[in-house]
């Protein structure tokens, strides 16, 4: 086992705090409408320019291992927030840094770290309740566009495009963001269905760059049982080969000999084919296969209705314009099913939603409804250079996640105002002892950090902005950093999703609490000797062994 270096108490915390500050200072310059860009070196290709907090955080790895521990814990705040809410990563990082800095000062002054953490947790719970109470449901398309615009750093075109996409496919529909081949950013809405089953073998892949199977104008075979031998299917497979079209097989499973035979045929080029498992389980799987059948004009091959595999003909296969399959998802675009049949099926599912008493069943039925009634919207992001396209794509991804979050939990005034107003709810709150009360005060001060940073990035003194907003009792009154005016933020369209603000605060407090209560840090000790120069010394990188 390799030797370890160990630091204790304030030595460990000070080292980790340095790492926290390095990462947070690099991330927080991107906050707000006047946030700056960060340029990241890439091992190959052009450098990347971004204003996306989590992209900056992911690139930072420090040479000092103790400092790196602190940096990686704060990086965790950004990625957790990104995973849950899809946006708000920079806000979360700024909050975490503020809580850690204040918390470690209090620990150094002799306060009990565990009581401080209890105080912090209590304050965060109150602040989150305040954010939830002040949130307002998103009702209009214009509000969705505003949320998207703010998250895309004031890019109105992106905000409106996302609102249009959500209007077309609904909040439940599938919206993907791709890089365009042109300089224009455009929205493409295609009716289609996506389900969470990927290809059964990577040998089916047709696009190695994207690791995807792409089938144009495929025929689709739906089989509700396991497929373990292709013998009964040979007549229809020969007919498919003669038709010159690719084949998608959706079955409970395709195993053993059947899968091997399909793969061999695909590799030899005799049959363009892919196989995926049917979505869902039990009765729900049957229902979803039926949905796919209606969408693609297919007949489900099922012994329940007396159809055997050997009797399958080309007429029983479904058809679609295109099918894309990744390792996790399958998307069927433009099925040829009759519109009247699809509408009847949608009406039937809606009735089932009304009749069911189980929340779980209701949720699953709504998922099916979204898949049938929704569609696939593709936002193609264009730009003059590759660097510009990648930077814009980051912003569109953020904006899309933010609008989804807004549809989930509503909106609050943006620009850090909701957090600042939540600090008012902590006035007069005390803990069970002085140290807990100090923990509450830490959160109260930390809630000012995002708005201070937004103001400072805009070249305005943060303390003055904080003072002015706290004096005003209107919950929507705040500072619009874009225009540098004090306005009603909701009227001005400066709004944030409540879910993003809540998630940022929860994750920041969670990781900051862990850092404050750290009493020892352990890392691997550096190896002796600097190792042999590249290409020289002992083979296989053995030059740094201590013989």
From Swiss-Prot:
Top-rank EC class of the record's enzyme: isomerase
Induction: By heat shock.
Subcellular location: Cytoplasm
Signal peptide as annotated in the record: none
InterPro entries tied to this protein: Chaperonin_Cpn60_CS (IPR018370), Cpn60/GroEL (IPR001844), Cpn60/GroEL/TCP-1 (IPR002423), GroEL-like_apical_dom_sf (IPR027409), GROEL-like_equatorial_sf (IPR027413), TCP-1-like_intermed_sf (IPR027410)
Catalytic activity: ATP + H2O + a folded polypeptide = ADP + phosphate + an unfolded polypeptide
Keyword Protein transport assigned: no
Stored Pfam families: Cpn60_TCP1 (PF00118)
Keywords on record: ATP-binding, Chaperone, Cytoplasm, Isomerase, Nucleotide-binding
UniProt GO MF annotations: ATP binding; ATP-dependent protein folding chaperone; isomerase activity; unfolded protein binding
Gene Ontology annotations of biological process type: protein refolding
Domain of life: Bacteria
Predominant localisation class: cytoplasm
GO cellular component, one term: cytoplasm
Region (Disordered): 528-547
Keyword Secreted: no
Enzyme Commission (EC) number: 5.6.1.7
Functional summary from the UniProt entry: Together with its co-chaperonin GroES, plays an essential role in assisting protein folding. The GroEL-GroES system forms a nano-cage that allows encapsulation of the non-native substrate proteins and provides a physical environment optimized to promote and accelerate protein folding.
Binding partners and assembly: Forms a cylinder of 14 subunits composed of two heptameric rings stacked back-to-back. Interacts with the co-chaperonin GroES.
Family stated for the protein in its record: Belongs to the chaperonin (HSP60) family.
PANTHER family: 60 KDA HEAT SHOCK PROTEIN, MITOCHONDRIAL
UniProt name for this protein: Chaperonin GroEL
């Amino acid at each position: 086992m390799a030797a370890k270096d160990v630091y204790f108490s304030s030595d460990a915390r000070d080292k980790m705090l340095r790492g926290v500050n390095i990462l947070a200072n690099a991330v927080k310059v991107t906050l707000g409408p006047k946030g700056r860009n960060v340029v990241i070196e890439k091992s190959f290709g052009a450098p990347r320019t971004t204003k996306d907090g989590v992209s900056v955080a992911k690139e930072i790895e420090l040479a000092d291992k103790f400092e790196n521990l602190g940096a990686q814990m704060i990086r965790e705040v950004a990625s957790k927030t990104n995973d849950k809410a899809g946006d708000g990563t920079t806000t979360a990082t700024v909050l975490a840094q503020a809580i850690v800095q204040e918390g470690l000062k209090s620990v150094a002054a002799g306060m009990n770290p565990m009581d401080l953490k209890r105080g912090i947790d209590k304050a965060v719970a109150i602040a989150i309740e305040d954010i939830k109470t002040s949130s307002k449901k998103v009702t209009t398309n214009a509000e969705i566009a505003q949320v998207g615009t703010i998250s895309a750093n004031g890019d109105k075109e992106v905000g409106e495009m996302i609102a249009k996409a959500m209007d077309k496919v609904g909040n439940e529909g599938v919206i993907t963001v791709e890089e365009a081949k042109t300089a224009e950013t455009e929205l493409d809405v295609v009716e289609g269905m996506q389900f969470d089953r990927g290809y059964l073998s990577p040998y089916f892949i047709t696009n190695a760059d994207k690791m995807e199977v792409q089938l144009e104008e495929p025929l689709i075979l739906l089989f509700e049982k396991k497929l373990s031998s292709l013998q009964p299917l040979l007549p229809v497979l020969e007919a498919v080969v003669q038709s010159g079209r690719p084949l998608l097989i959706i079955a409970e499973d395709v195993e053993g000999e059947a899968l091997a035979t399909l793969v061999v045929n695909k590799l030899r080029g005799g049959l363009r084919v892919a196989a995926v498992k049917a979505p869902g389980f039990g009765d729900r799987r049957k229902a979803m296969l039926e949905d796919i059948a209606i969408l693609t004009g297919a007949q489900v091959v099922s012994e329940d209705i007396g159809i055997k595999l050997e009797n399958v003909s080309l007429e029983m296969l479904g058809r679609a314009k295109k099918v894309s399959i990744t390792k996790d998802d399958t998307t069927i675009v433009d099925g040829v099913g009759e519109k009247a049949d699809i509408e009847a099926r949608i009406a039937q599912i809606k009735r089932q939603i009304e009749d069911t008493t189980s929340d779980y069943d209701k949720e699953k039925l709504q998922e099916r409804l979204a898949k049938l009634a929704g569609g696939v919207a593709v936002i193609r992001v264009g730009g003059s250079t590759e660097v510009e396209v990648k930077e814009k794509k980051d912003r569109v991804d953020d904006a899309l996640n933010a609008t989804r979050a807004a549809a989930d939990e509503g909106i609050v005034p943006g620009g850090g105002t909701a957090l600042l107003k939540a600090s008012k709810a902590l006035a007069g709150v005390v803990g069970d002892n002085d140290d807990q009360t100090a923990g509450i005060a830490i959160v109260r001060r930390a809630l000012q950090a995002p708005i201070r940073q937004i103001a400072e990035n805009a070249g305005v003194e943060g303390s003055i902005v904080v003072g002015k907003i706290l004096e005003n009792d209107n919950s929507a009154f705040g500072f619009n950093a874009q225009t540098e005016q004090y306005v009603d933020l909701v009227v001005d369209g400066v709004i944030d999703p409540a879910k993003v603000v809540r998630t940022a605060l929860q994750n920041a407090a969670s990781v900051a609490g862990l850092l404050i209560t750290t009493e020892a840090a352990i890392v691997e000790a550096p190896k002796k000797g600097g190792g042999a120069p590249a290409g020289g010394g002992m083979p296989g990188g053995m030059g740094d062994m201590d013989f």
